[in-house]
């Protein structure tokens, strides 16, 4: 069965928005060139080895591999095979002195290969790309809503039954990810951060959930090894009295949703710090609900962040967000897009933006407690959760 393609009308609209944004940035712009597969997917609906060239009145996708696949799955108007970057100059003989590129993803090696045939000076356009992707179209929102429904079903509905005495972190994460993929999920989580890798997600028990990783995230994990700080440990087994952190994304047709959930495996009242654990959980639920009420078109992310920080109980301030300086983040084709609910983000939120909100509290000697859901900013009224509730089942009894 063929995969669902990005509609031609959607691609045309994105290209129009790109040209308008570039003209607003630089009225004299004459060419941009994108080689990153994610940018390529956004504007052409296919991910290939090649380059997308856009001018004010022309756009061509040059494909090294695989041209046949690109033609089969993309509705982009002009797709051409390319043996080398020399082929670009055959179509665009007048290469300008300055060409806009995605500086964050274009390597020096790729730039050198391009300059061998196309002598230009690169100029960054990353801010334009981020701004375009931050506001989702109706098509993109449909993808994310569908991902959110699947996400909620697996994490809230199926995951509790996967908890059992002796299951490892790695096995638990793998089983949950398999449940997502079996139901149409992508099986990958893409990031902008250089320190992040395209991985399944994490499952962490008790103290392991406090172990920081290179990824700018409150969720901790000791990983499968020192070389992979993700998924979870195959050695750490689940036992009664453990807290369980699941931070496992979901995605459909390129678009992600983010959701975290914490469980207590056993009877919470038997834990010596049951009161602290319960209070931390209630605090995180209240903070997520309050944040969601503030996520409105026109609201300023930095102001929301400061407001929520002021509501954190003094007893939990030291462990709030496990050392991270944000409360939530935009999400879409990657897990970590902009804007971010943090200091310095002063541009108002817009209808069609999607953000994950993830209040979490680190409790020494216990683990990370918290919640997370992905929200859609609407034209009027508070944001709507795409991934379900934050006040979910907490205690899972050992069967």
Q: Which role fits each region the language model picked out?
A:
Residues 1-399:
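Active-site neighborhoods and metal-handling regions in enzymes and metal-associated proteins
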């Amino acid at each position: 069965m063929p995969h669902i393609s990005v509609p031609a009308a959607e691609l045309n609209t994105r290209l129009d928005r790109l040209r308008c944004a570039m003209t607003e940035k630089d009225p004299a712009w004459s060419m941009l060139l994108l080689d990153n597969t994610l940018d390529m997917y956004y504007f052409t609906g296919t991910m290939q080895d090649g380059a997308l060239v856009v001018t004010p009145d022309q756009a061509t996708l040059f494909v090294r591999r695989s041209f046949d696949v690109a033609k089969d799955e993309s509705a982009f108007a002009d797709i051409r095979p390319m043996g080398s970057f020399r082929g670009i100059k055959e179509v665009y003989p007048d290469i300008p002195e300055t060409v806009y590129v995605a500086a964050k993803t274009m390597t020096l090696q790729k730039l050198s290969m391009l300059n061998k045939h196309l002598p230009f000076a690169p100029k960054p356009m990353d801010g334009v790309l981020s701004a375009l992707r931050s506001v989702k179209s109706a098509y993109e929102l449909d993808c994310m809503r569908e991902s959110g429904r699947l996400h909620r079903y697996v994490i809230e509905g199926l995951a509790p039954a996967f908890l059992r005495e002796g299951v490892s972190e790695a096995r638990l994460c793998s089983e949950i990810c398999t449940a997502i993929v079996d139901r149409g999920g992508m099986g990958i989580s893409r990031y902008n951060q250089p320190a992040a890798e395209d991985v399944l997600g994490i499952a962490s028990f008790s103290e392991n959930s406090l172990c920081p990783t290179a990824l700018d995230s409150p969720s901790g994990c000791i990983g499968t090894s020192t070389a992979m700080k993700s998924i979870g440990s195959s050695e750490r087994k689940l036992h009664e009295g453990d807290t369980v952190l699941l931070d496992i994304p979901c995605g459909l047709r390129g678009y992600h949703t983010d959701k975290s959930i914490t469980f207590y495996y056993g009877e919470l009242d038997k834990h010596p710090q049951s009161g602290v654990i319960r209070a931390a959980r209630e605090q995180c639920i209240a903070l997520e609900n309050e944040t969601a009420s503030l996520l409105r078109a026109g609201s300023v992310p930095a102001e929301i962040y400061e407001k929520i920080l002021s509501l954190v109980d003094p007893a939990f301030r030291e462990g709030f967000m496990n050392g991270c300086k944000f409360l939530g983040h935009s999400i879409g084709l990657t897990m970590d897009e902009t804007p971010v609910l943090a200091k310095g983000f002063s541009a108002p939120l817009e209808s069609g933006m999607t953000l994950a909100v993830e209040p979490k509290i680190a409790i020494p000697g216990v683990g990370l407690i918290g919640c997370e859901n992905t929200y859609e900013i609407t034209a009027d009224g508070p944001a709507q959760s795409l991934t379900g509730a934050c006040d979910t089942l907490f205690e899972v009894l050992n069967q």
